[in-house]
């Protein structure tokens, strides 16, 4: 009995009261970027607007991987405009992968919650207050945006890409049974310590990395809440999804199926 009480008093089991945001809560938004010069000012402005209106404490950490289009210069200007207490540029010299970008960002994050999202305007910051409310209502370890539940959806894709996405998600649901409706989405809120542990367990790269994060979360018995979101295809620049990514996705899916 005493052992059980001690276990429940450990950091893993301590939870805030449901439905309440603590004054100490801070949300660190990680924005990995590569060639996002046009999109970055818009997404940062929308983030600042959303957090200012909702009243949540926040910081935005930009992790630029040596973009040749001047993304770093834009980020430096944004840091000056909004202040280094809100915008932190933490660049790297070259592309080193999404997982390592999150690790790099978390080293500089002072929040106890981490929000990950795309910097290309595919994910609208207006959903962040819903993520936070959902997390507090259920004391979830993770809250994931979903395109495949409720009033969630995808806009700006042609029919072919929508079909590929639906089929890929259907296959992953059958093979992996993840307990979440959208495995490949990258708009999520994590408890910081949960994200740190999951990244330490994951070995995948690219788009499969997001899938593995949810699969490992299920294995570790972390709780996952979902919020329907509208995903909009990138406004500026070219999509980074191509034939090589699709092949990597299929290989990664089979690897996860065989090892989880």
Swiss-Prot record:
Superkingdom as given in the UniProt entry: Eukaryota
Region (Disordered): 1-20
Pathway(s): Protein modification; protein glycosylation
Residues found modified as N-acetylalanine: 2
InterPro entries referenced in this protein's UniProt entry, alphabetically: DPM1-like, Glyco_trans_2-like, Nucleotide-diphossugar_trans
Binding site for Mn(2+): 120
GO molecular function: dolichyl-phosphate beta-D-mannosyltransferase activity; dolichyl-phosphate-mannose-protein mannosyltransferase activity; metal ion binding
EC number(s) stated in the UniProt entry for this protein: 2.4.1.83
UniProt cofactor note: Binds 1 divalent metal cation.
Residues engaged in binding GDP-alpha-D-mannose: 32, 34, 36, 63, 65, 118-120, 147, 234, 240
Enzyme class (EC, first level): transferase
Major location (coarse): endoplasmic reticulum
GO aspect biological process, one term: protein mannosylation
Assembly: Component of the dolichol-phosphate mannose (DPM) synthase complex composed of DPM1, DPM2 and DPM3; within the complex, directly interacts with DPM3. This interaction may stabilize DPM1.
Protein family (similarity comment): Belongs to the glycosyltransferase 2 family.
Protein name: Dolichol-phosphate mannosyltransferase subunit 1
Species whose genome carries this gene: Bos taurus (Bovine)
Name of the gene encoding the protein in the UniProt record: DPM1
């Amino acid at each position: 009995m005493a052992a059980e009480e001690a276990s429940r008093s450990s950091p893993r089991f301590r939870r805030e009261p449901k439905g309440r945001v603590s004054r100490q809560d801070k949300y660190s938004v990680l924005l990995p970027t590569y060639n996002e010069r046009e999109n970055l000012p818009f997404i940062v402005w929308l983030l600042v607007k959303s957090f200012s209106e909702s009243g949540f404490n926040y910081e935005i950490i930009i992790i630029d991987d040596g973009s040749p289009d001047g993304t770093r210069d834009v980020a430096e200007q944004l840091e000056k405009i909004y202040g280094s207490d809100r915008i932190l540029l933490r660049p790297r010299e070259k592309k080193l992968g999404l997982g390592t970008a999150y690790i790099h960002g978390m080293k500089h994050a002072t929040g106890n919650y981490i929000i990950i999202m795309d910097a290309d305007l595919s994910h609208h910051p207006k959903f962040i207050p819903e993520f936070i409310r959902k997390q507090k209502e259920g004391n979830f370890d993770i809250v994931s945006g979903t395109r495949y539940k409720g009033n969630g959806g995808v806009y700006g894709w042609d029919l072919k890409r929508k079909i590929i996405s639906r089929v890929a998600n259907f296959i992953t649901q059958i093979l992996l049974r993840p307990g979440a409706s959208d495995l490949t989405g990258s708009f999520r809120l994590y408890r910081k310590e949960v994200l740190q542990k999951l990244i330490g367990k994951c070995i995948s790269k690219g788009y499969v990395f997001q899938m593995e994060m949810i699969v490992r979360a299920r294995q570790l018995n972390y709780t996952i809440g979902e919020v329907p979101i509208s995903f909009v295809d990138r406004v500026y620049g070219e999509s980074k999804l191509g034939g090589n990514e699709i092949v990597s996705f299929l290989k990664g899916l089979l690897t996860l199926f065989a090892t989880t």
